[in-house]
Amino acid sequence: MKVLVRAMSLTVIGLCVCLILMHLLDYNVRLDELNKASHLAMANTQIVMQENIEDIYYNTNNSRMKIGSNEEYLKLFKDNFMILVNSDGTYSISGYSDVYKGLLCVIISHEYKNFLGQDKTITKKIINVIDVVRDNG
């Protein structure tokens, strides 16, 4: 009887440890995906914005796409971000952008259900400012 009780208690402890590890791994995988996607989307968005600023400064027409308003600037980030993520759940992206200063401040919230059915949220805030193009001549 003692052996059976010990075996059952070890089984329950093992299951609890497995559940805790699964919860931690699920959170870390989602956080890692959110970090990588947000930083890559920010870099891609800022490259396009830098091209726009250089077009204005050097009076050229070399940028991939024109960004004319703050809403377009934020929408470009959202599009770049949504292409990069592939986990389930919902993403809400809000923020502030300024086309003339090259400023982009974004708050990303990722809401998902973990393996136990609980609602979880991960939130990340990113701020980026483009350096001003200067004439060295």
Question: Where is each model-derived feature located?
Answer:
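Generic detection of short hydrophobic beta-strand segments and adjacent strand-loop junctions
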Residues: 122-132
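N-terminal signal-anchor/signal peptide hydrophobic helix marking the start
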Residues: 1-13
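Short amphipathic secondary-structure patches
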Residues: 25, 29, 44-116, 130-136
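Stable alpha-helical structural segments in soluble proteins, enriched in small hydrophobic residues
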Residues: 37-45
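C-terminal juxtamembrane segment of a hydrophobic transmembrane alpha-helix
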Residues: 11-27
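Juxtamembrane interface helices immediately C-terminal to a transmembrane segment
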Residues: 22-38
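Beta-sandwich strand segments
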Residues: 116-122
